[in-house]
């Protein structure tokens, strides 16, 4: 995981796509958010964790596992349990409602809030999700998303390389449904 790959790893970068409504198909975009497509083989002018990290699915899974382990991975403490707890604690006041999670529509309300860098499920039943209370999640611009569910001891990482999220097929909802249907005893 880094802000650039360097030329030696350029062949490991997956292409990014966008849905072209006029053409009725997925295409390689010529620009990103009104600007030139970034060159991830070169260091960016400004390193922005919210706008330009490149990673592997395995790195993202290890990060998610570290969060599930309350800040520890492979016997090494990377974050304090208190820091991870803060990440999963809602900080949005009751009178503030937002309608996006960055790349797709989402409702922050009494059942779903936002902690330090994560959307947080406060009340799974009220949120209408199969995830457990305390689940932390987020998505990225290119159809990347993850969740960490401490109630059910589950992590999930999805990466589809599509600007605008996972698309109209709502792959995120399908992934959650199939994952939790596969659990023998979801605790919810």
Across the structure, where does each feature detected by a protein language model lie?
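Short, well-ordered beta-strand elements
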Residues: 146-147, 153-162
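Short, small/polar residue-rich loop motifs at catalytic or cofactor-binding pockets
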Residues: 140-142
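Short, surface-exposed loop or secondary-structure junction motifs
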Residues: 1-131
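C-terminal substrate/ligand-recognition segments
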Residues: 55, 144, 148
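Short, structured beta-strand/loop micro-motifs enriched in basic residues and often containing a Trp
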Residues: 137
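Short, ordered coil/turn segments that flank beta-strands lining enzyme active or ligand-binding pockets
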Residues: 22, 150-151
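Active-site beta-strand/loop architecture of penicillin-binding DD-peptidases
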Residues: 132-134, 152
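Generic C-terminus detector
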Residues: 164-185
């Amino acid at each position: 995981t880094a802000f650039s790959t360097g030329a030696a790893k350029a062949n490991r970068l997956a292409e990014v796509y966008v849905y072209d409504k006029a053409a009725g198909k997925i295409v390689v975009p010529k620009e990103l958010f009104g600007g030139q497509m970034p060159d991830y083989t070169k260091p960016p002018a400004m390193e922005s964790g919210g706008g330009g990290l490149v990673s592997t699915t395995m790195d993202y899974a290890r990060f998610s596992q570290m969060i599930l382990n309350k800040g520890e991975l492979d016997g090494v403490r990377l974050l304090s349990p208190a820091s991870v707890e803060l990440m999963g604690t809602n900080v949005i006041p009751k009178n503030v409602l937002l309608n996006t999670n960055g790349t797709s529509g989402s409702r922050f309300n009494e059942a779903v809030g936002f902690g330090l860098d994560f959307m947080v499920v406060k009340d799974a039943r009220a949120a209408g999700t199969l995830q457990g209370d305390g689940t932390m999640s987020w998505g990225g611009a290119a159809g990347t998303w993850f969740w960490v569910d401490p109630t059910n001891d589950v992590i999930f990482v999805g990466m589809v390389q599509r600007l605008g999220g996972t698309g109209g097929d709502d792959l995120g909802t399908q992934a959650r449904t199939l994952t939790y249907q596969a659990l023998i005893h979801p605790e919810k």
